[in-house]
Swiss-Prot record:
It is an enzyme of class 3 (hydrolase). PROSITE patterns: PEPT_TRNA_HYDROL_1, PEPT_TRNA_HYDROL_2. The keyword Hydrolase applies. Its EC number is 3.1.1.29. The gene is pth. It comes from Histophilus somni (strain 129Pt) (Haemophilus somnus). This is Peptidyl-tRNA hydrolase. It comes from the Bacteria.
Length: 194
């Protein structure tokens, strides 16, 4: 049933960044790995950690680029090209400044909104913006000059709790996506607020 064949979780590599807001996409992949019992392993030809799982009879590939965020497109395009997965069958999980913690939404297409990971993915997919995005709200520092340090810092315990609740709902919705399709998953997730 799933129209999605590749799920990508964005983040920066290394322990220094593991708990920072910019790694919210990777946090969601980690939850999916626990839910669906798969392990990511490093595949250097894809510049990332990858896994393959069959869920509800659907083959799904998972990717966490091991490059820094602004080079995420290299991994996405390498894996998508190798397995002939078109952009319309890719779901990218990423942090979203424009949503408060506790909100997550799915959408298809659009620009990068200043997100350097999305910017590079769009560029590496030959400017094709038609991939899906699951945007995980992390809140905004209020001043655009503070954004760079904000995304590279840990959320407050209260914000982390709200983000975790949205990640739990997103995990449920990705399971729905695999069984019943992206429209049903989108409608449910986009109505959720922790």
């Amino acid at each position: 049933m799933s129209e999605i064949k590749l799920i990508v979780g964005l983040g920066n590599p290394g322990d220094k960044y593991a708990d920072t807001r910019h790694n919210a996409g990777e946090w969601l992949i980690e939850r999916l790995a626990r839910r669906f019992n798969f392990n990511l392993s490093v595949e250097s030809k894809f510049s990332g950690k990858t896994a393959r799982a069959v869920i509800s009879g659907q083959e799904m590939r998972f990717l966490v680029p091991t490059t820094f965020m602004n080079l995420s497109g290299k991994a996405v395009s390498a894996l998508a090209n190798f397995y002939r997965i078109p952009p319309e069958q890719i779901l990218v999980l990423h942090d979203e400044l424009d949503f408060s913690p506790g909100i997550a939404k799915i959408k298809q297409g659009g620009g990068h909104g200043g997100h350097n990971g999305l910017k590079d993915i769009i560029a590496q997919l030959a400017n094709n913006k038609n991939f899906y995005r699951l945007r995980i709200g992390i809140g905004h520092p209020g001043d655009k000059n503070l954004v760079a340090s904000y995304v590279l810092n840990k959320p407050s315990p209260t914000d982390r709790q709200l983000i975790d609740r949205s990640l739990e709902e997103a995990t449920d919705c990705i399971e729905i996506l695999m069984k019943e399709g992206i429209t049903k998953a989108t409608n449910r997730l986009n109505a959720f607020k922790a």
